[in-house]
Amino acid sequence: MIVPVSPVLPVVQKGFRMQHPGKLLGIFLLFGCLVIASAAKAEAVPASGTMEVLFTPWDDAEGAIVRALAKARHSIHVQAYLLTSRPIGNALLDARARGVVVEILADYALLKNGQNSQIPQLAAAGIPVWLETRYAVAHNKIMLIDATDADGAVITGSYNFTWSAQARNAENLLILRGNRPMQRRYLSNWRRHRAEAQPYAAQPTNADGTSP
């Protein structure tokens, strides 16, 4: 729903003479138009499908992600701030081995400065990876499974794809299934981020994911 925004003019103190009031009014009108235009881009998605709700450390969110990835038939799209979980990394490798197209977007700074990332190992196995460099923090934690299918899934929440998110942190995770309009919106946003990200050049790795 688009809500009209009325420009609010500043309060002028008694005895103060405003310079160029026409220009100031124009600025506020332009600002109001920009707000309305931005709201016009918002799109409500009808509720449908099912929702699996998990809270760590009590629920097995990591296991739920691994099981969902195991059911992927043709595509998995990942947006990761952190991806250090070996079970999740192995599930992505297994998916690729059975012919599923797996593609990953990752935060550049965390990959550069962090430890135990699964990204080098995944890239070395042939999974395409792009690094997000445009933003201060690429903080999305999203997985899209068979996003163009009627029974596809969106995985999202505060949950990073890490051991700590499962065992030490208080996190939430949603697995939303069977909402094609929502899946398409997430996939469109994923592709928008990929278009401005930088391809990751895979480096040789040891079996444990470290550099030789």
Model-based region annotation:
Residues 1-11, 21:
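Short, low-complexity, charge-dense intrinsically disordered segments
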Residues 26-35:
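Bacterial N-terminal signal peptides
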Residues 48-77, 81, 188:
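N-terminal targeting signals for Sec/Tat export/insertion, comprising classic cleavable signal peptides
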Residues 77-80, 103-107, 130-131, 144, ...:
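Structural recognition of the beta-strand scaffold that forms the well-ordered cores
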Residues 82-86, 108-112, 135-137, 149, ...:
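Solvent-exposed loop/turn segments at secondary-structure junctions
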Residues 146, 150-212:
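Signature of lipid phosphatidyltransferase scaffolds
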